[in-house]
Amino acid sequence: MAAELHVELVAADRSVWSGEATLVVARTTSGDIGVMPGHQPLLGVLESGPVTIRTSEGGTVIAAVHGGFISFADDKLSLLAEIAELADEIDVERAERALELAKSDADAAAQRRADVRLRAVAVR
């Protein structure tokens, strides 16, 4: 069993994060899943939510992910998201305004996106 896994977090428009990790936690349609080196191969559908990546250097990377797929085999993990952004990139005030606007417009999808962004920031 390898001591680390290679992770690629990719959004539709860009590569968000790439590197070595010891653990990745993501939300799928079947529930939260933690992937460590040596995990059984998997393919799943990502739900909107924060993704936590524990890097090999001991750091933590948090990203807000909005839908997509997760794939793991041979200690290579791919997170292919419709939309993804690192928690450090999220403007909290803008996300809070977007959440309030979505609530007033009764826009459930926009409300869910803003909520995920704020949860990702809260986790970091």
Swiss-Prot record:
Domain of life: Bacteria
GO cellular component: plasma membrane; proton-transporting ATP synthase complex
UniProt-recorded Gene Ontology molecular function terms: ATP binding; proton-transporting ATP synthase activity, rotational mechanism
Keywords in alphabetical order: ATP synthesis, Cell membrane, CF(1), Hydrogen ion transport, Ion transport, Membrane, Transport
Subcellular location: Cell membrane
Alphabetical list of CDD domains matching this protein: F1-ATPase_delta
This protein's record includes keyword Ion transport: yes
Main subcellular localisation: membrane
Membrane topology label: Peripheral membrane protein
Signal peptide (UniProt feature, chain positions): none
Protein family (similarity comment): Belongs to the ATPase epsilon chain family.
Assembly mode: F-type ATPases have 2 components, CF(1) - the catalytic core - and CF(0) - the membrane proton channel. CF(1) has five subunits: alpha(3), beta(3), gamma(1), delta(1), epsilon(1). CF(0) has three main subunits: a, b and c.
Function: Produces ATP from ADP in the presence of a proton gradient across the membrane.
NCBIfam families, A to Z: ATP_synt_epsi, PRK13442.1
Protein's UniProt name: ATP synthase epsilon chain
